[in-house]
A protein has these predicted regions:
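Short amphipathic alpha-helix that is part of the acyltransferase structural core
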Residues: 1-31, 39-49
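Extended, composition-driven regions rather than compact fold-specific motifs
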Residues: 35, 42, 125, 153, ...
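Conserved acyl-donor/pantetheine-binding loop and adjacent beta-alpha core of acyl/acetyltransferases
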Residues: 50-84, 142-146
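Conserved acetyl-CoA-binding loop-helix of GNAT-fold acetyltransferases
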Residues: 84-87, 93-106, 126, 130
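Conserved GNAT acetyl-CoA-binding A-motif
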Residues: 108-119
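Conserved active-site alpha-helix within GNAT-family acetyltransferase domains
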Residues: 119-142
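C-terminal "cap" of GNAT-fold acetyltransferases
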Residues: 141-164
Length: 164
C-alpha cells in the first residue's frame, strides 16, 4: 500500500482507470486525480487493485454537496473529502482498504472530513462507520447515475480525538 503526493503518469492512468472500474468516474477524472491532495493505492502483482484519495475540494463543490444533503453543517468546516474508494472484488474483506485509509487520514492533520457514497453501497457505508464517519442530512439523487441516491458522511476532529 502506498500513499503518494506525486505519482508517475502511468500510475495516474492506472489510478483513474481503477476509479472508473468502480463506476464513480466523470469526465476529467485523470486531471482531478492529478490535483488530489493525496492518492492512496493498493498494488498487487504490479497492478493497482485498490484506490482511495484525500481531496481538498473547492468551496463551491463542498457547498453543493452539503446543500443537496440538506445538511445544516457549515461546509467550510470540512476542508477534506475522502473519496475515490474502490477495491477489486477478490481483494475485499481482508482489511486492506481500512489500512490504506488509515495511512491517508493523518495527512488531514486532524481536520474535519466528509465523504459521499451511494446509499445502496452497504460495504462502503459500513466502512465509513468503522472509521468514525457518521451519516449527515438526507440522501439525494446521484448526478452520475440518476437511478441511485447518495448519502453524505462526516467525521469531526473533536469526536475522533475523544474516541481514540
Amino acid at each position: 500500500m502506498t500513499v503518494q503526493w506525486q505519482v508517475s503518469d502511468a500510475e495516474l492512468d492506472q489510478f483513474a482507470a481503477k476509479v472508473a472500474d468502480g463506476g464513480e468516474v466523470a469526465d476529467g477524472m485523470r486531471q482531478r486525480a492529478k490535483r488530489a491532495f493525496r492518492l492512496g493505492m493498493i498494488v498487487y502483482e504490479d497492478a493497482i487493485i485498490g484506490t482511495a484519495a484525500l481531496k481538498k475540494p473547492a468551496a463551491s463543490y463542498r457547498t453543493k454537496v452539503f446543500k443537496k444533503a440538506g445538511s445544516q453543517l457549515d461546509p467550510a468546516a470540512y476542508p477534506y473529502e475522502l473519496g475515490w474508494i474502490f477495491l477489486d472484488v477478490p481483494h475485499r474483506k481482508k482489511g486492506q482498504m481500512t489500512r490504506l485509509i488509515d495511512d491517508l487520514l493523518p495527512a488531514a492533520k486532524g481536520a474535519n472530513l466528509f465523504a459521499t457514497t451511494r446509499t445502496s453501497n452497504d460495504i462502503m457505508r459500513g466502512m465509513l462507520a468503522q472509521i468514525k464517519f457518521s451519516e449527515e442530512g438526507t440522501e439525494y439523487q446521484s448526478d452520475q447515475n440518476p437511478a441511485e441516491t447518495v448519502k453524505l458522511f462526516v467525521r469531526n476532529a473533536h469526536q475522533t480525538e475523544a474516541s481514540e
